[in-house]
C-alpha cells in the first residue's frame, strides 16, 4: 500500500509539473505572438503617419485597363478612389470597350472631355481622348479612351503615358486593393538608402 501511494504521488508530481511547464510554454508563445502583432501595429501606424505627413512622400499613379466592364466598373473604380494615400491618382484606360463602360463612367463620375497633349513615350494603339471630373469628390480620377490594343499591356502603357507621378502601379480594374496598399508599395522606395536606377516603379 505504501509503495502504491509513493508511486501515485510521483506520477502526480510528474504530470503536475509537466502540465505546468506546458502552460508556461504556451503562455510564453501566446505572449510572443501578441507582442509581435502589437509591434507590427505600431510600426505600421508610424509608417502611415510618416507617409501621410511627410512633404517628401512621392505621388503614385494607379493604372487599370478596362475592357467591357460595364457591370462592375462603378464599384471597382469607387474602391480604388477610396485608397488611403496622400498623393495619388487613378487612371482608368478604356481599351476600346464595345459595351457601356465609357458611358457609365462618364455619367456616374461627372466626367468631361478635357484638352490633353498626349505624349507617346511608349508606343500604343491610338489615343482618342481624356476625361476628368467636374466633381471635386472625384478629382483624383482620370479616364483615358483609346483604341483596343488587344492586350492589357498596351492599355497599361497608355496609362503610363498620361501618368503625372514618378511611380505607378499597374493592376486590373476588377482587383480589390487593400486600403493601405499604396503605403506598402511605396515603403521600400522611401526607406531604401540606394538610389533607384529607374524613375518609375511598376508592380502588378
Name each model-derived stretch:
Residues 58-61, 89:
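Cell-envelope/extracellular polymer assembly enzymes that use nucleotide-activated donors
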Residues 48, 76, 121-163:
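Glycine-rich, basic loop-to-helix element that forms the pyrophosphate-binding segment
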Residues 168:
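Short aromatic/hydrophobic "clamp" motif used to bind/position activated sugar donors
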